[in-house]
UniProtKB/Swiss-Prot annotation:
Disulfide pairings: none
Pfam families noted in UniProt: DUF179
Domain of life: Bacteria
Source organism: Xylella fastidiosa (strain Temecula1 / ATCC 700964)
Name of protein: UPF0301 protein PD_1276
Any one annotated GO CC term: cytosol
Length: 188
């Protein structure tokens, strides 16, 4: 008899102050895919050096929306840093998209960016360059080693909270003040 598999899809990982990996220090990552082969997610609180306007220009997509052009593109993680990922909240699905949770999708399709540029795309979307990846069992080990806290994803945290507030606010959803935690452990 096999054990039921727990999926971490649609969970936010919140890096604890003791996180040893600088890619994820004070990071918040949305887990988009998780199975026996590993996990994939997108870091939600690291700005890249690019705006969405610059990315759209490189793709040959024009937009009249100043707000869209000024939107910060996230540094989604160290894996595939030249590849774009779009997390969006919508009833409509653009191109091939992966359902993360209730109306929340991930896509690498250019279609959603073109629709956003035309004003017909999802009203709430995050664009990231790169993603985070974990080998089979790696993320589970990191959880056991107390590198991460976990909370269910929340659309308001993803789309309505400023980047610099996401780390503390995500932990606050489960009553944790990250600034009161130490970054070392001891043995009794």
């Amino acid at each position: 008899m096999s054990m039921p598999t727990m999926t971490l899809v649609n969970q936010l990982l919140i890096a604890l102050p003791s996180m040893p990996d600088p890619h994820f220090a004070r990071g918040v990552a949305l887990i988009c895919q998780h199975d026996s082969n590993g996990a994939m997610g997108v870091v939600l609180n690291r700005p890249s050096e690019y705006t969405l306007g610059e990315v759209l220009f490189q793709m040959g997509i024009e937009t009249a929306s100043e707000t869209l052009r000024e939107q910060v593109v996230l540094a989604g993680g160290p894996v595939h840093p030249d590849r774009g990922f779009v997390i969006y909240d919508s009833e409509h699905v653009w191109g091939p998209s992966l359902l993360i949770g209730d109306g929340l999708y991930l896509t690498t399709s250019r279609d959603v960016l073109a629709a956003m540029a035309e004003g017909s795309g999802p009203s709430r979307a995050l664009v990231a360059l790169g993603c985070a990846g974990w080998a089979a069992g790696q993320l589970e080990l990191e959880l056991v080693e107390n590198n991460w806290l976990m909370v269910p994803a929340d659309a308001s945290l993803l789309f309505d909270t400023a980047l610099e507030q996401r780390w503390q606010r995500a932990a606050g959803r489960i009553g944790v003040d990250l600034f009161r935690l130490t970054d070392y452990t001891g043995h009794a």
